[in-house]
Amino acid sequence: MAERDRLLHRLDEGLAALGLDLPDSVRGRLIDYVELLARWNSAYNLTAVRDPGEMVARHLLDSLAIAAHVSGASLADLGTGAGLPGIPLALLQPERQFTLVDSNGKKARFLREAVRSLKLANVRVFEGRVQDVPGQFDCITARAFATLADMLNWAGGLLADGGSWLAMKGKLQDEEIAALPAGFRIEQTLALAVPRTVGERHLIVIRKA
């Protein structure tokens, strides 16, 4: 089996487990993204995950596992790194506008190349600190970026009224949840079942109080 076919097969298995039915065009672009990331990763060390097959599970499927919880017309992905979960979600949801935020120059260069080569007209890249991002967003995502308190203290003002903050975490820490800043409340905490991944994965949905 050719490498690209192997990656598509692994993606399809995961999508079936997540209950997602995607058109061939989106499936192909998701694999294009993994292949681009794998090429850049060898030179720029963008992610600790080296194997493209592992990237499908630990990056693509992990990102797509929260797709049903994204809402609104605009989304900011804070500390996006190599574009996670922002790029997989943007490929899945072209009707939304995505802003990918990262202060690391080499990661921002990769993001701009990914936007160009994947023809992501609904994505822009902001290279800088989350504290400096202009505007407000209907939805904010952050994947293992910082503690809940730090994220909300730095960037809570980016969340529009009525919007939702989707914090992707591994193992839940009671003390972290207890330290939620004033003005915010946890709407729900969900355990995520991500195919072919080891360890706990959780989604914490936060709204303004």
Where are the predicted features?
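Residue-level preference for alpha-helix termini and adjacent loops
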Residues: 19-21, 45-48, 54, 60, ...
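Residue-level recognition of conserved structural "scaffold" positions that shape functional pockets
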Residues: 52, 86-88, 177
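Conserved SAM-binding loop of SAM-dependent methyltransferases across substrates and taxa
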Residues: 82-95
